Regions:
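Hydrophobic alpha-helical segments typical of transmembrane helices
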Residues: 27-30, 39, 91, 111-115, ...
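CoA-thioester-processing core
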Residues: 1-44, 58, 73, 77
Length: 142
């Protein structure tokens, strides 16, 4: 499963296995967790593609951009992410995926533990200090 997805306006998305006698069972696992049962069943049972705008409306992708702007949008997205604390992003991703399938109570327990851990990071102290001082971030972890 990918964390983020950006597509050009020309992109289409499909689970076409049924059209050739092979049900897309394994792709359906990740797709269903993003777009829900009825929408994934539409893709699985019909094999018909959806356009990029529909994929975005359904929650399958984050952004739709003109084809000529795709590389620039991807670069902008990645530049924003790599400007963040790598240690914090790593902890956040691990925590997010660890809690996402749990009950609300269990998810809050996992997230609270991660927040407490995160606050002990050098990057957290440096980031808060830089924010309060209105200075650019300079992550100790690199």
């Amino acid at each position: 499963m990918c964390d983020l997805a950006v597509a050009s306006e020309a992109a289409t998305f499909a689970l076409p296995g049924a059209t050739v006698g092979v049900f897309c069972s394994t792709p359906a696992v990740g797709v269903a967790r993003n777009i829900g049962r009825k929408r994934v069943m539409e893709l699985l049972l019909t094999g018909q593609p959806i356009d990029a705008r529909t994929a975005q409306a359904w929650g399958l992708i984050n952004r739709v951009v003109p084809a000529e702007a795709l590389d620039a949008e991807l670069r902008r997205f990645t530049d924003l992410i790599v400007a963040r604390s790598a240690a914090t992003i790593a902890l956040g991703k691990r925590t997010f995926y660890r809690q996402i399938g749990d009950s609300l109570e269990a998810a809050y327990d996992i997230a609270s533990e991660a927040m407490a851990c995160n606050m002990s990071y050098e990057d957290a102290a440096a980031g808060i200090d830089a924010f309060l001082g209105k200075r650019p971030m300079d992550w100790p972890s690199g």
